[in-house]
Amino acid sequence: MDLEEQERDILIQTDDDDCHVDVSYVNDDDDSNASFSLSQNDSAFWPQSYRHSVDLLTGVTPPMVSFIQGRSTETSFSSSIASLYKRRPTSIANSFVSSTSKQPLLSEKDDVSFLSSQVGLSNTDLSYGEPNFCSFPQSVLNGINVLCGISLLTMPYAVKEGGWLGLCILLSFAIITCYTGILLKRCLESSSDLRTYPDIGQAAFGFTGRLIISILLYMELYVCCVEYIIMMSDNLSRVFPNITLNIVGVSLDSPQIFAISATLIVLPTVWLKDLSLLSYLSAGGVFVSILLALCLFWVGSVDGVGFHTGGKALDLANLPVAIGIFGFGFSGHAVLPSIYSSMKEPSKFPLVLLISFGFCVFFYIAVAICGYSMFGEAIQSQFTLNMPQQYTASKIAVWTAVVVPMTKYALALTPIVLGLEELMPPSEKMRSYGVSIFIKTILVLSTLVVALTFPFFAIMGALMGSFLATLVDFIFPCLCYLSILKGRLSKTQIGICVFIIISGIVSGCCGTYSAIGRLVGELNWMVQ
């Protein structure tokens, strides 16, 4: 019997009525154990597609692409599925030998069936090939790519809002979110059944926890798509500022025209069945961040804009907005479990986090200091909007800020699309490619409507950072950790988690209130 048949023989048929999970933890003294038993019907496993779509989003397990044969989508999913069986053989075997009523948290066979229906393949098309685990350098690049994204552009604006001392909060947020990333790792290590953040939520709080965390993660991705539209619109308006258009008595200014144009540009990329090329292009985000930082420094030092001292030390009135932006800069916990699961040496995951967060903090602080020193109180929500257009470095930075969202938009929207398609009736008609195109188009148009209604890049980022990021990156990792490993934690560990939870609640409430107030003020100004 070949390897593929052996792997398939270990699969246990999923019970159609219910699914039971038993996750046990035994302390070092063997005196007591904490047992978590999750029992839900098949619908409790929504979303099943999350880990695969996030793998494509981050490129954590790069597929072997074959453009000539047109099989890159199949290979990508095959590699991702195969990794489920080859990550920890002994743990996987143990999860199957307990009893026939005890199934894995997510049935891999169900994943194969669902994914094959999404891409129009039979189960046999999704063969279990050799998984492509990431080396340590690849994992570091993936971590940096996830963390150091579009929020880099708005760091100087955050310093303007909070003052120079706000950078201390940025540093503290980096330490806290790096620590909560390690907490997620410890949760994943507690059971081989746990693969993703929603899995952790279910292990901690049942299906309710899985549902809440999944919705929050999808909301993060949706807001990122809105930010991509605003980002492209703002930078194109910077290049072509005086364009207006009148349609049936409706006057459109330059930002509105380019928001619509940007949506029309990214829409065909969302329709693609094969997103592997976009995934590879998006994986170069770390180099894009370096390029943007170098362009900013070049304009300040070589092109003669110069650096100036001054600025506020601390602005308590606007500090909550800065807090939200700083939180937005570290909102990568949605995919950290995928990076961990993709590593050849998962024991080095804490070092991956340390290097990734350290790199991001260095670049965030460097760009924040450089941008605010160059433009002072005139700094806009994206530093590319302040850079003089006559310089080559400025043009490179602006067009980079335009092109990058084009490669990321479809990847960010895909997990949401697959999650919604799971909720559709399981009929061939409702799972057709035409229905998928319709769902994708509606979602894209909805992001355009939101971007036109709230065209404020920094404020939307602050709102996302204050509300979503504090929940996903601060509060829930600690709550899940305390729940899953209760009875095994020291008082110090519990105290640290409680401190982080309280800090997250306070900063989240203050930042959300301030961001909403600023949003209302900007809308009133637009109306006037």
From Swiss-Prot:
The keyword Transmembrane helix applies. One of its GO terms (biological process) is amino acid transport. It comes from the Eukaryota. Keywords: Amino-acid transport, Membrane, Transmembrane, Transmembrane helix, Transport. It is found in: Membrane. It is a multi-pass membrane protein. The chain crosses the membrane at residues 139-159, 164-184, 211-231, 247-267, 280-300, 319-339, 349-369, 398-418, 442-462, 465-485, 496-516. InterPro entries: AA_transpt_TM. The keyword Protease does not apply. GO terms for cellular component: organelle membrane. Pfam families: Aa_trans. Belongs to the amino acid/polyamine transporter 2 family. Amino acid/auxin permease (AAAP) (TC 2.A.18.5) subfamily. PANTHER family: AMINO ACID TRANSPORTER (PTHR22950), TRANSMEMBRANE AMINO ACID TRANSPORTER FAMILY PROTEIN (PTHR22950:SF692). This is Amino acid transporter AVT1F. It comes from Arabidopsis thaliana.
